[in-house]
Swiss-Prot record:
DNA-dependent RNA polymerase catalyzes the transcription of DNA into RNA using the four ribonucleoside triphosphates as substrates. This is DNA-directed RNA polymerase subunit beta. In plastids the minimal PEP RNA polymerase catalytic core is composed of four subunits: alpha, beta, beta', and beta''. When a (nuclear-encoded) sigma factor is associated with the core the holoenzyme is formed, which can initiate transcription. GO terms for biological process: DNA-templated transcription. It comes from Saccharum hybrid. Signal peptide: none annotated.
Length: 1075
């Protein structure tokens, strides 16, 4: 965070900074650290040694541009060169060799892998170290445990049982005596007793059997190995057994790492050097000693809070990429060893480069990274729905992933907000559903200490000198440091009314909220936004909203679709500009100069005697099928300054974020069309393209070689197809640019050869061959057809040919989508709804000046949801629209005076009423409300209605992608019922409760059809088609449906036989014995 020259002013840090800093640390430190660990590969038989050096590695500039990598589905990467040495007998060779390619981060903070933008999000994990806890069992006896967590997530648990014996348990396996563990680690009994504070406790459970186990290190190792590896029988001590134990336990389970060593030293008051990153006998001894102190009352019962951020660490992009680089070097080591053996079989003289150059070896690095980006849960496809999404995605923190929690097993406490989150992790912004509380977002001022992995937050230091001079020094505090400070909240009323010495202010101290005297304050918050993420900081009047609705709002803003005509909000928070700039969707001038020319593809800039061409993005598809487009904003001949906006991206206006539209809304019921969150809209929003958005769909097809060895062919000459379907194809069989295509049209014509046997020829085919010598076509038509709902304009066709038989064709189709019934809209306060009806504008309710309303919301959606911020926003928006003003309001404006929001809104409405000479804008009897008229009758409504200008977004959940119907389709293999889901062409589920509803209406025949013919009655399903075609009566089958037979089989697996038979009029009188 940077200080400005102005007193108390500061700038918000760059929102993508965390990703860039992480990647820079990987390049500058991570690569060197892993290269230092690379061992010297020796072959003693042939006196050969191969070694890589950490110093002087180089990364070349990427060989392709970002755009070309996306266009050609390649990986944007850079070649890594490393110094290597090869000793071959008495010959020493030094050479700088290439060991492969590393993906490079681009200007968005993302990676391009196989043409797809991907991002690595930060993972938050329990920090390595030791954690103590004490809990009462069912008898009320206190059980104390200490858990040592390694850098790789392995656990060593120490516990004292009811008989006051101390046990160790490795990775939740069988428990083992602590004395055996310490002896196996190399300590004898005298050393143990001399270095503990409670030797008598150790001696109390030292019986003859225990003494025998630890009389020598070898016996202790054998005993430990038997328990650890769960091996029975008589073992004999050997070096190989010792090595296996060293590898499986001491190296994997006991590596603390740099962070773990610091935490261990701090918790147990040890002074072991930082470079000693493995668990030592001294650590286990001190941990056991502390545990005894806790159990027997001589120590303090200080349970560690596992959810406190001081006990968590962030694994950023640097750590994850470094781990993969280490993995790739391990594979490289094995590959080089194989190559060395091969060299001696061929009896050729090796060089450092020839050992690494073979194809499989040189691509090890890039394939390791491509596998990582493709399969690792924290390497996600970059969300490009709108500029806000692009900015926010890289600031996510997740507890999920390898070594972390899972959505199904995470406890409520691990999901909850913790006092240490303040100013570091947003208390609002998290996902809904099973992962609630497990994925969060960093607060806007938070930064990551990449050395220790902790999240830091900035505060103003209020020292005695600073109080005298009225200066403010900014300090960044980590979670373990801010416990010792009295922190005044920056959004409290008293801090902004001029501090008197005797005044009492609200503060935080040791995770508690207090009110204390101003003289006792050490630091204070720097900014009202400090506690929130970007999503939360874009909600105006957030302090008047319930947190659940604010959470929904911050998630829904990320789902807003960029509109064809963007508009910035009348009421905002002031963070819109920085969010738009940091998303990098706009083009910013990097130097000053003069515009030579500008069009939709590029801007030519003259600067310092040079002509610079700045390319623009024109109708490019995003990962979410939205349209990315840059519009030039500078005319020819204009002089520009450095930092000026040259072209605006989608959903930005004037350099500010513009996700929605300011529309006139009324809160009133209207004929039940806005019941339960439905929304009534005016046809003006359709005809004037207010909520029209562009979407780009991608369709692709690839040629292959059949099992008989013949290749598929892309062609326009496709027999048995109507000419109408082929009208848009060029002579190569690919759809033309600019064509308008409808559902079912052929986009790419393709034929797949088939081998037909003599017997399969029809009689006519034999005749044609005999008379004319013509071969009958044996190709199958496998063209790419436009699916349902895909109609639009072809804007791009890509032909990618890697060899003569491997051709990929991609067709991009632009769709223009107006708002329609079934689309989802939302405000910025969690007020979401589905369009239920589009009303002619003359039927919409209208204001006293004749203006028809654009949207009608249900007023019952406000009180129970407690998102009153929308009322403030709409009223202030109306005033701003009439006064031609825009407002930027920081949250918690009650810190200036009480009822500040209400006073601002009423004063602006009064001013608007006065200036426009419209008394209905502000009526003192019901301020904010107005009498409005029914558009159908012209009569005024009985009650005054709240009207205003709200900023409403159109979300990506659109009816075109949701609507679905099925006549017949695939069935499940086991139950023979229709499969589930739109993607699989699935059916509509009729569940138990739906059956009850139909039973309530007594519709027996409809119900029987639903449960048998339309579902899982195999024979009836086949015969109903025949009966329908020939107009016969649908037969009533007596055999059971498939689901009943599945039930019978499941009962048989439980050794229960269930038989059934039909009871009819003929066999109704049966004996009980027969049944």
């Amino acid at each position: 965070m940077l200080r400005n020259g102005n007193e108390g002013m500061s700038t918000i840090p760059g929102f993508s900074q965390i990703q860039f800093e992480g990647f820079c640390r990987f390049i500058n430190q991570g690569l060197a650290e892993e290269l230092e660990k690379f061992p010297t590969i020796k072959d003693p038989d042939h006196e050969i040694a191969f070694q890589l050096f950490a110093k002087g590695y180089q990364l070349l500039e990427p060989s392709i541009k970002e755009r070309n990598a996306v266009y050609e589905s390649l990986t944007y990467s850079s070649e890594l060169y490393v110094s290597a040495r090869l000793i071959f007998g008495f010959d020493v060779q030094k050479q700088t060799i290439s060991i492969g390619n590393i993906p490079i981060m681009n200007s968005l903070g993302t990676f391009i892998i196989n043409g797809i933008y991907r991002i690595v999000i930060n993972q938050i994990l329990l920090s390595p170290g030791i954690y103590y806890r004490s809990e009462l069992d069912h008898k009320g006896i206190s059980i104390c445990t200490g858990t040592i967590i390694s850098d790789w997530g392995g656990r060593l648990e120490l516990a004292i049982d009811k008989k006051e014996r101390i046990w160790a348990r490795v990775s939740r396996k069988q428990k083992i005596s602590i004395l055996v563990l310490l002896s196996a680690m190399g300590l004898n009994l005298r050393e143990i007793l001399d270095n503990v504070s409670y030797p008598e406790i150790f001696l109390s459970f030292l019986n003859a059997k225990e003494k025998k186990r630890i009389e020598s290190k070898e016996k202790a190792i054998l005993e430990f190995y038997q328990q650890f590896a769960c091996v029975g029988g008589d073992l004999v001590f050997s070096e190989s057994l010792c090595e296996e134990l060293q590898k499986k336990f001491f190296q994997q389970k006991c590596e603390l790492g740099r962070v773990g060593r610091r935490n261990m030293n701090r918790r147990l008051n040890l002074d072991i050097p930082q470079n000693n990153t493995f668990l030592l006998p001294r650590d286990v001894l001190a941990a056991t000693d502390h545990l005894i102190g806790m159990k027997f009352g001589t120590g303090i019962l200080d349970d560690d809070d596992m959810n406190h951020l001081k006990n968590k660490r962030i694994r950023s992009v640097a750590d994850l990429l470094q781990d993969q680089f280490g993995l790739a070097l391990g594979r490289l080591q094995h590959a080089v060893q194989k190559t060395i053996r091969r060299v001696f079989i061929r009896q050729s003289k090796p060089t450092p480069q020839t050992l690494v150059t073979p194809t499989s070896t040189s691509i090890l690095l890039i394939t390791t990274y491509e596998t990582f980006f493709g399969t690792y849960p924290l390497a996600q496809v970059f969300d490009q729905t709108n500029p806000l999404t692009q900015t926010v995605h890289g600031r996510k923190v997740s507890c999920l992933g390898p070594g972390g929690l899972t959505g199904r097993t995470a406890s409520f406490r691990s999901r909850d907000i913790h006092p240490s989150h303040y100013g570091r992790i947003c208390p609002i912004d998290t996902s809904e559903g099973i992962n609630v509380g497990l994925t969060g977002s960093l607060a806007i001022h938070a930064r990551i200490d990449h050395w220790w992995g902790s999240i830091e937050s900035p505060f103003y230091e209020i020292s005695e000198k600073a109080k005298e001079k009225k200066e403010r020094q900014v300090v960044y505090l980590s979670p373990n440091r801010d416990e010792y400070y009295m922190i005044a909240a920056g959004n409290s009323l008293s801090l902004n009314q001029g501090i008197q010495e005797e005044q009492v202010v609200p503060a935080r101290y040791r995770q508690e909220f207090l009110t204390i005297a101003w003289e006792q304050i050490h630091v204070r918050s720097i900014f009202p936004f400090q506690y929130f993420s970007i999503g939360g900081s874009l909600i105006p009047f957030i302090e008047h909203n319930d947190a659940n609705r604010a959470l929904m709002s911050s998630n829904m803003q990320r789902q807003a679709v960029p509109l064809s005509r963007s508009e910035k909000c009348i009421v905002g928070t002031g963070l819109e500009r920085q969010t738009a700039l940091d998303s990098r969707v706009s083009v910013i001038a990097e130097r000053e100069g003069k515009i030579i020319s500008s069009d939709s593809h590029k801007i030519l800039l003259s600067s310092s005697g040079k002509t610079i061409s700045i390319p623009l993005v024109a109708h490019r598809r995003s990962n979410k099928n939205t349209c990315m487009h840059q519009k030039p904003r500078v005319p020819r001949g204009k002089s520009i300054k450095k930092g000026q906006i040259l072209a605006e991206g989608a959903a930005t206006v004037g350099g500010e974020l513009a996700l929605g539209k300011n529309v006139l809304v009324a809160y009133m019921p209207w004929e039940g069309y806005n019941f339960e969150d439905a929304v009534l809209i005016s046809e003006r929003l359709v005809y004037e393209d207010i909520y029209t958005s562009f979407h780009i769909r991608k369709y692709e097809i690839q040629t292959d070689t059949t099992s008989q060895g013949s290749a598929e062919k892309i062609t326009k000459q496709i027999p048995h197809l109507e000419e109408h379907l082929l009208r848009n194809l060029d002579r190569n069989g690919v759809v033309r640019l600019g064509s308008w295509v409808e559902t079912g049209d052929i986009l790419v014509g393709k034929l797949t050869p088939q081998i037909a046997s003599e017997s399969s020829y029809i009689a006519e085919a034999g005749l044609l061959r005999a008379i004319f010598g013509l071969e009958v076509s044996t190709s199958k038509e496998t063209s790419l057809k436009l699916p349902i709902g895909g109609r639009g304009r072809v804007i791009d066709v890509k032909w990618i040919q890697r060899d003569p038989f491997d051709i990929m064709v991609r067709v991009y189709i632009l769709q223009k989508r107006e708002i329609k019934v079934g689309d989802k809209v939302a405000g910025r306060h969690g007020n979401k709804g589905i369009i239920s009806k589009i009303l002619p504008r003359q039927d919409m309710p209208y204001l006293q000046d004749g203006t028809p309303v654009d949207m009608v919301f249900n007023p019952l959606g406000v009180p129970s949801r407690m998102n009153v911020g929308q009322i403030f926003e709409s009223s202030l928006g109306l005033a701003g629209d009439l006064l031609k003003k825009h407002y930027r309001i920081a949250p918690f404006d009650e810190r200036y005076e009480q009822e500040a929001s209400r006073k601002l809104v009423f004063s602006e409405l009064y001013e608007a009423s006065k200036q426009t000479k419209n008394p209905w804008v502000f009526e003192p009897e019901y301020p904010g409300k107005s009498r409005i008229f029914d558009g159908r009758t012209g009569d005024p409504f009985e009650q005054p209605v709240l009207i205003g200008k709200s900023y409403i977004l159109k979300l990506i959940h659109q009816v075109d992608e949701k609507i679905h119907g099925r006549s017949t389709g695939p069935y499940s293999l086991v139950t023979q019922q229709p499969v589930r889901g739109r993607a699989k062409q699935g059916g509509q589920r009729i569940g138990e409760m739906e059956v009850w509803a139909l039973e309530g209406f007594g519709v027996a025949h409809i119900l029987q059809e639903i449960l048998t013919y339309k579902s899982d009655h195999l024979i009836a399903r086949q015969e109903i088609l025949n009966a329908t075609i020939w107009g016969k009566r649908v037969p009533n089958h007596e055999d059971p449906p498939e689901s009943f037979r599945v039930l019978v089989r499941e009962l048989r697996s439980l050794a229960l036989e269930l038989n059934h038979f039909l009871v009819s009029e003929k066999n109704f009188r049966v004996n009980r014995e027969d049944v």
